[in-house]
Amino acid sequence: MVIEQAELADVLVLTPQPFRDERGVFTRTFDADELDAHLGVPGVAAGFVQDFQSRSVQGVVRGLHGRSRRSEAKLVRCARGCVYDVLVDIRPDSPTFGAHEAFLLDDNDFRHLYIPPGFLHGFQAVSDVADVCFRTDRPHDPREGLAVAYDDPQLGIAWPAPVTVVSADDRAAGSWSDLLAALAVTAPRPVAGQES
């Protein structure tokens, strides 16, 4: 598995090395020892406690979601189809605070992301159907959820396809400015993100 640092501080891009032959493809999608060795902290990967999977049709946007109290780390991959996956750094002490980065994740190269605590996450399905798998290090608790509007002009995320469906909760999400106020921080306008 190849593990690389993303542009956003502390985010890792994990690319498995699949074995392909006439039968198809076989790959290892998770290795706790490799992830811990790269992070330099034993036991991080063993702390993942729940797996989730979503299915979305083309154009659906989910997010931007985070945790308000106890932040969570995530492993995210696309198990079917292709998604445009976006992260926003909401850690006030981070050198990339307020920045976002986008990644194309698909079921061909099996690339996935390690997202440390302190990020908003969202994605858009760009294939006809897309299944996204999440592994988290904290049990889900809807009382801890926070959200920022996927189309917040201060973040300026350029979703690659027309947005077809957004949940009522995501449509009602607050702004980047609302989040800054809730976090009791002041910051310059977020820097524009980029695609990896």
Task: Tell me the role of every PLM-derived stretch.
Residues 105-128:
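Conserved metal-binding segment of the jelly-roll/cupin
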Residues 1-108, 129, 136-196:
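Non-catalytic, conserved peripheral segments adjacent to functional cores
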